Amino acid sequence: MGSHAPAVAGKPDPKKGPYQATPWNIQLSATDTPGFTHVGNLERRSADRASDLVMNNHSKFHTFHDEIVGFHNHISHHVLTLWALGATPDEMQAAYDFNKPFQLLTYYNDPSVNIKLRDPEFFRQGLGNFELYGDYVRFFQAEVAAKGTQTVLHDYLFKGDTLTEDLLARLFSGFLHPLINLGFALEFQQPFLAAECLASTCMHPPYPAEFLTATEQHVECNGRPRSLPILSIAEGMRLDPVVATAVGPEDGNNRIADALLKRALKELIPHLSYFQVEPTEHDLARKTAEILQASAYICGAAQHPRKVEALDFVMLHSLTAAVFFPTIIKQEWISIETRARLLEWKGRSDLITYAALGCPKLYPDRITGYQPKQAATGWSDVVQRARVYQDDGHACKVIRALMCAENVCQPFEGEEGFPLKKADFLTVAHMTMDSVERMSDPNWVRQTEKVKQMSAQGRGQHSQVSAIMLRWVRWCGTEGAWDDFPDLEELSPSA
């Protein structure tokens, strides 16, 4: 994604014809853009179908599919993940067709709006305005075409001025979706996705600054403490009576900003300060492995002792965002200090997510003692199940992230902060697919009024959105979070 390559800045290279990635076009390649974590034998026909589907998503749909609640459009995430997992064109097409009925059509304003975005004041005033999303996309496409991906990402995220600090905080908002967008752009080397990432970032609120910059200020005033493992910090938060009780069942979907930070920000900051990343290649590698390890461990171990297994929907985003950091830490055009800062912010965001879940007690035996329904199968079978599973893409993203974690964490196995062994990642992958595939059991599906309200079904939202709510537990450490899940003894043999 060099800033001087013809495929990134300026006009497309005529020698390459239509098969190139530009600010206006997606083009994947089995040889050049398979992704950091991928299966073998990727095919050109799948690359072309994935490219076409992501382009279709861009031309038709908004980054959100619900402007009021803020539900995200995951089609590009889904398709790109399926591409890396070796999906066939038909499998990717099926995923796209399954998800398109509940998307929000994108829209554009008068071309003059795009021109106005060049005015810094108008640019700032438009932040958070969903109606300007398409205009921000066009603005950033033009920026990338003129300057190159690296320069534009630096100028709008890493420059260090007031605007970029604001946008950088927004990058960590919305269950980390803007950060995930950035990860896809970098891992799959698509300038087009970089423009969409920046536009999506502009749509999100800046509330992460409340704890991210405040923690940096705390460290600046009090000195850098000795860095502790994320899981040790999480346990300290669970034992903190203010932090552990800061959220409750009455809090809404955006309980990080609306509940946790309002009630426990002062108490949270010292805990967050214990996650430190040194600007060295060794610490970048170790802490990248640690955020993968910790998020995978919490996803698998944050269970209810008397309920069937389920992964927490909010926490799984920490895992599916961590999958991109092996790529991010290798972007040498980003200063090593900034890469360390991004990783630090990611670890601290994961800790905030854990606190927002209600600091759930972790049960490692639910991982080590788990008996998969298809115990004799390995990664290839789990991947195949994820490729054909009909959802909005979260299941296959979790599976790919667990594959990545198994690989990246292996050099640190057995060290402090790394409780999972190599085989445990596959076990959690089995747990993931077993839990979401239970949707086929009629005894599992409990379409309660609470679920309908959460999914906005009452005002015309598609029924698949409420189905998404049923696949995963939410805010798993709070009272009532598991009420709609069967007890362990209720599970039918066929489930």
UniProtKB/Swiss-Prot annotation:
Annotated EC: 1.-.-.-
UniProt GO MF annotations: oxidoreductase activity
Covalent S-S links between cysteines: none
Coiled-coil boundaries: none
Residue ranges, annotated region (Disordered): 1-22
Keywords on record: Oxidoreductase
Gene transcribed to yield this protein: aflY
Name of the protein in its database record: Oxidoreductase AflY
Pathway: Mycotoxin biosynthesis; aflatoxin biosynthesis
Source organism: Aspergillus parasiticus (strain ATCC 56775 / NRRL 5862 / SRRC 143 / SU-1)
Matching InterPro entries: Questin_oxidase-like
Taxonomic lineage: Eukaryota, Fungi, Dikarya, Ascomycota, Pezizomycotina
